[in-house]
From Swiss-Prot:
It holds the Pfam family tRNA_m1G_MT. Belongs to the RNA methyltransferase TrmD family. The keyword Electron transport does not apply. Its main location: cytoplasm. GO terms for cellular component: cytosol. It is found in: Cytoplasm. It comes from Legionella pneumophila (strain Paris). This is tRNA (guanine-N(1)-)-methyltransferase. It comes from the Bacteria. Homodimer. One of its GO terms (biological process) is tRNA N1-guanine methylation. The keyword Methyltransferase applies.
Amino acid sequence: MALHLGVITLLPEIIQGIHYGVTGRAIEQGLVKIDCWNPRDWSSRPYKQVDDKPYGGGPGMVMMYEPLHAAIKHARSEMKENCKTIYLSPQGKVVRQNDLKQIAIQKQSLLFVAGRYEGIDERIINHHIDEEWSLGDFVLSGGELAAMVFIDAIIRLIPGSLGHLGSAEQDSFMNGLLDCPHYTRPATINGLDVPDVLLGGNHKEIERWRRKQSLGKTWLKRPDLLEKIQLSETDKQLLAEFKCEHGDSC
């Protein structure tokens, strides 16, 4: 059964970009189904208007309750019963890799609501939204790009969506750490060499090197992540070696 993901958006053309690359192949293979619904199709106002001035005054416009509610109701009727409705907002929780992994495993249908203007009527959020998600502490012009980011991140976790089974497993954050460095041909260019261990063919040593680099990169770039995972004694030794090799106390 395909994972069903939907988007409520005033600009469905933007979402069409998801039909290319890895995500596009997953759609063609029947691993995932993507649908869009435009609130303008449920507007009773002249010129399909979906926004109005905010009560209390202030700049900008607010997306109206009626067309949004009708679009959400219609979309949910076409999706699975376990569908969750997600409003994309900088006020939402920052979603982590493990959250998305669970969605891919459970094939949890999601309906993303992409806001525009100054936002959407709060009554939609309070009564028709299950969760609010954010990409981080910054503001976009609309929720469409955020929806595409989450859709892409979820799809690559679906078995069969990537060319190699290990590709997603090696991604940063999959095991709580950042990914190790990657190299390809040529072995030497502009005086820059690929590490010898990767050229030697000893798979045990290669895996040890990759684990050390993964631990080390996490320590250098995201030390906060190391505080959230339980390191084995081998991991502690590898991290100590990395620190020593990079000028830290040995």
